[in-house]
Amino acid sequence: MTFRNCVAVDLGASSGRVMLARYERECRSLTLREIHRFNNGLHSQNGYVTWDVDSLESAIRLGLNKVCEEGIRIDSIGIDTWGVDFVLLDQQGQRVGLPVAYRDSRTNGLMAQAQQQLGKRDIYQRSGIQFLPFNTLYQLRALTEQQPELIPHIAHALLMPDYFSYRLTGKMNWEYTNATTTQLVNINSDDWDESLLAWSGANKAWFGRPTHPGNVIGHWICPQGNEIPVVAVASHDTASAVIASPLNGSRAAYLSSGTWSLMGFESQTPFTNDTALAANITNEGGAEGRYRVLKNIMGLWLLQRVLQERQINDLPALISATQALPACRFIINPNDDRFINPETMCSEIQAACRETAQPIPESDAELARCIFDSLALLYADVLHELAQLRGEDFSQLHIVGGGCQNTLLNQLCADACGIRVIAGPVEASTLGNIGIQLMTLDELNNVDDFRQVVSTTANLTTFTPNPDSEIAHYVARIHSTRQTKELCA
């Protein structure tokens, strides 16, 4: 038997993990083992919302050392993280300023300013990226306007996965899939857009040309002295998750479900027409020159905050209580900016219901019901938008990531969307990370080859839509009302 041992470092906005993958070439089987799992979260520092990158680096090194202590020879390492955030370095590679998180309020008002000064359509034609108030484009503008004293000291700007790869190898890299999330990469050249960079106030010299997944950045020297390749995987966690989505044919859509929900489809060409702009569709970079045509949805961040505020530890019990409640009594727009980082999520949800003359969710289960129903309805709207954009309906939706373990939300999604839902794999970002490593090691041919491995080894569960469910009837009433309004217009 020929084995490959690859390590994936997968950092999300709420947790991180170091996972060991063992790939057996002859039987094309892939097994994962969790080596180290650790918390991640927002911190308050000097008036900013920040990430504790030192703690994250220590956790990464601890996980890697654990693998080496077992006597396992690692063939390669890959790192993926969330998008848009960055670390600034001086000429000596030391940090400049704080690693500010995207949920910080420093970018307030800057997206509207950019649209006014540059033109919304021009920004979109250049980048193909959706307008989110925390995109790197606006973060850099906030930095250069609000902290000009830092500018003379900055030599490099590294996105989060590139920063941690640099800390392991001493080599700098700017990986393409994550770079596209910045709204600073030109969709035609795959390089930094000079006009957008100029508006941000950043110096182009801070960045190197983005590289596509699959190159070796450098080497990490393990405690035993071995030099282990660190591979530039699809370092945006959603890009990795999509690689591991067992998409079957052109009519398959995906939903990467976690702190954020990202719904979309793969395409060989981007969509930057007026319809895509009006729907705020993004065209993020994927592996093998594919585009991830998708839309960001606030996701389980709302639930995570409610769990924290209400000190709820038994999630299965909460879901069971939630399932017993009637559907669609409390509906909010999860994508409203008010939910990005409110002082109290529970109060913000209640206020949104109060302002729209709805009943007020008071209990833990009612708040969860509000979140799940609202997410499922938004999923249905977004899936409809995506189908209209490409001119073809979808036949199935693959839900991947940690959120796919929520069977209630999976069924609500199937019912609201009226589509077959296939849930799994759970550790999609980790698997996609491993997939690029195996391709770099010449163990697999391409993404489609890797997806065949995932399909045969991952635990997948199918949810069939129930047209008689409460949420399905609610969606039907909404569509009927919309059609009536359109006919009367």
Curated annotation (Swiss-Prot):
GO CC, any one term: cytosol
Organism: Escherichia coli O157:H7
UniProt KW Chaperone keyword: no
Catalytic activity, EC: 2.7.1.5
Gene Ontology terms describing biological process: glycerol metabolic process; rhamnose catabolic process
Cofactor requirements of the protein: Mg(2+)
Subunit structure: Monomer.
Cysteine pairings via disulfide bonds: C68-C222, C353-C370, C413-C417
Active-site residues from the entry: D237 (proton acceptor)
Signal peptide: none
Protein name: Rhamnulokinase
Functional pathway: Carbohydrate degradation; L-rhamnose degradation; glycerone phosphate from L-rhamnose: step 2/3
HAMAP family from the UniProt entry: Rhamnulokinase
Family assignment from sequence similarity: Belongs to the rhamnulokinase family.
